[in-house]
């Protein structure tokens, strides 16, 4: 509402630009290993990620979860804030008119408690981030254990406006898995 809404939109735009800058910069590293070997550690996208957005800051929370996940190459299925789901559908219209390929961002609205369980149990979802109360995060971890889904939970209130807490390399790292390639060299 009013100034708060304007600040949230400004912060969301800033966050989108931040992660757009990372799209071609999140690279792997190489390590020298004993015995004439080199190891390449390459981050790869998790695949299909489920994102359960926070109830507070519906736009900024959505952008804070979606942007890092797609910046490193994932496809996302998003459960937006149940309090303001139209913010997510409006954001989707922005993505639809951009260069974003169809199907990269998928938004499902409805009863949060039912959708969370189904998303956590779904075998085609490879990773799941949950921004909700402690009980919901615990439930997501429990339902995701059936197919060893990678999970990351944010329980309790988080200041989504603070870039030190809600953006950065930790989000990019959690959206990838590292593949190590061992290469022998020398004589």
Task: Go through each PLM region and give its residues.
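Residue-level signal for inorganic ion chemistry
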Residues: 73, 105, 119
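Substrate-binding/gating loop at the entrance of the active-site cleft, primarily
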Residues: 31-89
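Short acidic amphipathic segments
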Residues: 125-126
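N-terminal Rossmann-like NAD(P)+-binding subdomain of aldehyde/semialdehyde dehydrogenases
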Residues: 1-37
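C-terminal segments
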Residues: 14-25, 29, 129-187
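Short acidic capping loops at alpha-helix termini that bridge into adjacent secondary structure
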Residues: 47-48, 102-105
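Short helix-initiation/N-cap motifs at beta->coil->alpha
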Residues: 111-115
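Hydrophobic/aromatic ligand-binding patch that stacks against planar heteroaromatic rings
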Residues: 67-70, 118, 143
């Amino acid at each position: 509402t009013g100034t708060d809404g304007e600040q949230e939109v400004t912060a969301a735009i800033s966050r989108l630009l931040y992660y757009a800058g990372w799209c071609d910069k999140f690279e792997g590293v190489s390590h020298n290993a004993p015995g004439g070997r080199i190891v390449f550690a390459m981050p790869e996208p998790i695949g299909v990620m489920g994102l359960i957005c926070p109830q507070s800051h519906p736009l900024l929370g959505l952008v804070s979860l979606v942007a890092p996940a797609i910046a490193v190459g994932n496809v996302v299925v998003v459960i937006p804030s149940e309090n303001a789901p139209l913010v997510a559908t409006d954001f989707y219209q922005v993505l639809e008119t951009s260069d974003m390929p169809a199907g990269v961002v998928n938004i499902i609205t409805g009863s949060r408690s039912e959708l969370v369980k189904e998303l956590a149990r779904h075998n085609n979802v490879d990773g799941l981030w949950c921004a909700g109360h402690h009980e919901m995060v615990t439930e997501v971890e429990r339902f995701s254990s059936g197919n060893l889904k990678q999970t990351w939970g944010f329980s309790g209130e988080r200041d989504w406006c603070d870039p030190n807490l809600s953006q950065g390399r930790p989000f990019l790292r959690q959206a990838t898995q590292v593949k190590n390639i061992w290469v022998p060299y020398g004589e």
